Regions:
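Residues embedded in well-ordered secondary-structure elements
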Residues: 26, 38, 88-90, 105, ...
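Flexible, solvent-exposed coil segments and beta strand-coil junctions
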Residues: 10-18, 75-83, 142-149
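Extracellular loop and loop/strand-boundary signature of outer-membrane beta-barrel proteins
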Residues: 16-24, 84-88, 151-155
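Gram-negative outer-membrane beta-barrel transporters
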Residues: 1-61
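Active-site/pore-lining binding-face segments in mid-to-C-terminal subdomains
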Residues: 87, 97-99
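Compositionally biased, intrinsically disordered low-complexity regions enriched
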Residues: 78-84, 89, 134
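C-terminal beta-signal and adjacent terminal beta-strands/loops
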Residues: 53-76, 92-96, 103-172
Length: 172
């Protein structure tokens, strides 16, 4: 049986000018943690697992007011960031559990190993900032063109699925 763990705690910030306040950098997750272990059974079987966790990433929120203006949206086709709030948002932390089962066969001049590896068995979802989108519907069509606004909506972004892998190893 073996068990290994690592924890890294950090802060990554910078200033745009020497007299400015510190701002979190894009990779300021605050922590990264990993714990992994394996257990060897008889007859060439082994089971391993790894738990990984990482703190939330900072992000810059959108300028919803500017983005909803019809003229602004039509000029860029995408939302505008609110750079006065640069990296003030922070996503949730993320963790996932991976599990692997191995079976080894020994022959006179070689070893054959087969394994099943399941990544993210907990189906954890890695969040990204929600995307601000125009619905294409103008909420105030009778307003002057410079004041017309699109109705906006957020699209949630999250990914996370079980990733199975079957493998074969051969050693001579």
């Amino acid at each position: 049986f073996n068990l290994v763990g690592a924890l890294t705690v950090f802060s990554s910030e910078y200033r745009s000018r020497h007299d400015a306040k510190y701002i979190p950098s894009a990779w300021d997750n605050r922590f990264v943690a990993n714990i992994s272990g394996t257990y060897d059974f008889s007859r060439g079987w082994s089971v391993g697992a790894k738990l990984s966790a990482i703190g939330g990433t900072p992000y810059t929120p959108y300028d919803v007011d500017k983005s909803s203006l019809v003229e602004a949206w039509n000029a860029s086709g995408r939302p505008y960031y609110d750079y006065s709030k640069y990296n003030t948002g922070r996503l949730d932390a993320f963790a996932q559990l991976d599990v692997r089962v191995d079976k080894v066969f020994y022959f006179r001049k070689c070893m054959l190993g087969i394994y099943v590896d399941l990544q993210n068995v907990t189906f954890s979802k890695l969040r990204q900032p929600d995307v601000l989108m125009s619905t294409g519907v103008i909420e105030n069509p009778s307003a002057p063109p410079s004041e017309q606004r699109y109705k906006m909506k957020y699209i949630r972004q999250a990914s996370g699925t079980l990733v199975p892998t079957l493998g074969v190893t051969v050693e001579f």
